[in-house]
Amino acid sequence: MKKYKPKSGERIERQEEVIPPKVELPFEFSPEHYPVLLQEVLAAFYPLRDKKELSYFDGTFGRGGHYMALKYAYPQMKATVMDQDLAAIAFAQSRFQTEVEKGQLNVIHGNFTQFSEHNLNNFDMMLLDLGVSSPQLDQGERGFSFYNDGPLDMRMNQQQGLTAEVLINTASEDELIRIFKEYGEVYRPSRVVRAIVNDRKTKAFQTTGALAGLIERVDGWQVKGHHPATKYFMALRLAVNSELEVVAEAIPKMIRALNPGGRLAVISFHSLEDRIVKNIFRESEDLGRTVTKKVIVPTQEECDRNSRSRSAKLRIFERSAQDELTKL
C-alpha cells in the first residue's frame, strides 16, 4: 500500500497508536477524596510511560488523589505541586512528608498562575483539576455549598481577596445581574437580584443558608434534582476567585512549560471554562496538538459512584516533539 502524501497545506490528525490499559491500583490506594476521571488522566500520560525520568506538575493539588495514582503508575516521577488553599498545603506536607524529604515532591503554596514566578519549566506531565474540591464543599465554614450552612466566604485562598459576603452585599443590581448571567449562565436572574438588593437593605446576607433560602423562595425548583441556588453559587465563586481569567492566563504559559512530547491535561466543570480550554488548545496548534477531537467525560459508572463528577470534562494537549517540529 502506498503511503499517503498530504496535499500542500493539508493538516493531518495524528491518532493514538495504543489504547492504554486500565491501571489496577493497589488495595491500599486510599485517597481522602477519590479523584475525578482518574483512569482517564492516567491514560492521558500513558505514552510517556517508558521515559527513565518523568517530571510532573499539579496546579490544583487538593488532597493529592491524582498525584498518588500517578506516582504508583509511574514510580520514576518527580513532582511539583501547587494549591492556593492552605489546608491542602498542610495536608500535602503532612501526608507526603517522606516524599518531600526525599526530594521527590516539591510543595508550593500559591495559585497556579504563579508557577512561572517560581521558575518552573520542563515538565512531561501537567494537570489542572479546576473547580472546588470535595473537602472544600463539605466544610460549611468555607462557604462554597448551600447544603452546609456557613459564612459567605467562597475564597480559594482565605488569606486574600473579596469574600462572597462583601460582593453580594455591596455590588450594584446591574453588576449582580451581569455576574449571574455571565458566570452562572442564569437565564433570567433579575427577580432574584431585585430580592437580594431589597432584603439586604434591612439585613446583610452573612450565611450560605440565608442566600440559598432567598433564591429557593424566589426562583423555586425549576429542574428536578438541581437546587435553584446551584448556578448562582457557582457564579459567585467564579467571580470571587476570578477563575475564568486565571484559566485563560495560565494555560498558554503551561503549554510553553511542557517538554517536547509532554502533555497537559485539564479537567473543567463549567461550560465557560471548557470553552476557554478548547479555544486556547486550538490557538496553540503551532506548538502541538489536541490529543482527542471530542472532550472526555466520566463514565456512567463514575457518575453513579460520584454525582459531583457528572459535569467534568477532560481535554489533553501534547507539545510537539523536536523531531516533529522539523517536519511541520
Curated annotation (Swiss-Prot):
Keyword Transcription: no
Pfam families listed in its UniProt record: Methyltransf_5
Example of a GO cellular component annotation carried by this entry: cytoplasm
EC category: transferase
EC number: 2.1.1.199
Binding positions (S-adenosyl-L-methionine): G64, G65, H66, D83, F112, D129, Q136
InterPro entries: RsmH, SAM-dep_MeTrfase_MraW_recog, SAM-dependent_MTases_sf
GO biological process terms on file: rRNA base methylation
Domain of life of the native organism: Bacteria
Keywords per UniProt: Cytoplasm, Methyltransferase, rRNA processing, S-adenosyl-L-methionine, Transferase
Name recorded for this polypeptide: Ribosomal RNA small subunit methyltransferase H
Known function: Specifically methylates the N4 position of cytidine in position 1402 (C1402) of 16S rRNA.
Reaction equation(s) it catalyzes: cytidine(1402) in 16S rRNA + S-adenosyl-L-methionine = N(4)-methylcytidine(1402) in 16S rRNA + S-adenosyl-L-homocysteine + H(+)
Subcellular location: Cytoplasm
Organism: Bdellovibrio bacteriovorus (strain ATCC 15356 / DSM 50701 / NCIMB 9529 / HD100)
Family note: Belongs to the methyltransferase superfamily. RsmH family.
A GO term, aspect molecular function: rRNA (cytosine-N4-)-methyltransferase activity
